[in-house]
Amino acid sequence: MPKPAVIVVGADKGGVGKTTVSRTLLDYFSANNVPTRAFDTEFPRGTLKRFHPDITEIVDMTTTADQMKIFDTLNSAAPSVTVIDVRAGLLSPALASLRDIGFLDAAQSGQITFAVFHILGPSIASLDEIAETASFMHGAKYFLVKNFINNTSFFEWDQATYKTYFHRIKDATELTIPKLNEMAFEQVEVSSVPFLKFVANKGHHDEPANYSFVLRGYVRHWLANVWSEFDRIQLTDIVGKERSGPRPTVSGAGIGAPPEK
């Protein structure tokens, strides 16, 4: 049985697109045939669950009972990969809880694979978040994600200052999520389907849909760029997936032909 892998996606600031990143991760693992389950900590409504209802459970990560739902089942759950979409403002408290229950020690000793995707905003406050999370990163794969999905400009950052923060965490890796065409992003939001199903022109239950050919093309191109970042960091290798055959591509899902006039 493969070693459990836990991926935490979060930020202490809201509005930086962390759930968007979680959605791209779930699509990526699905395309790579990596069984995955997800926990949406946007309690009680949830956001991630709207797009991936079959594999996502809404939890309140501030309660011990719901922490047990996630971590007591790591070795018994059929999917070996767990993605946790952490509510805005909860990243530092969540990492503190992982320390207190001994999870970080288990990761450091190699019993569990642990990765953190820290979604950064454009302000200096995001750099302070890096300093706050640094003490929790022993034994973790730490990814600093610049997410341009909201047309963010990282203009407030002095590069020398950023590098000072960046180097506080050993082996930290930077990722870039490019901007997606706004109309395409909005249409996927309205459709409430995974990006991959939107590209393939399918509904939640794989029924044929009638999404715009143009917008699907924008999403396909954008998702391919995101996945190339995940390929670059060898994400499937990190979670212990043995590769057989070539890496799947977004175009493999097919966008179909343009609609007939």
Task: Please give the residue ranges for each predicted region.
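Nucleotide-state-sensitive switch-loop elements of NTP-binding domains
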Residues: P2-V8, A31-S97, Q111
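A generic secondary-structure signal
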Residues: Y28, T73, E132-F136
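Walker A (P-loop) phosphate-binding motif
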Residues: M1-F29
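Catalytic cores of phosphodiester-bond-cleaving enzymes
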Residues: M1, A125-I130, M137, V214, ...
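C-terminal accessory "lid"/substrate-recognition subdomains
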Residues: F143-K261
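Conserved phosphate-coordination/catalytic loops
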Residues: T20, M61-A65, I124
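Conserved catalytic-core segment of NTP-binding enzymes
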Residues: G89-V190
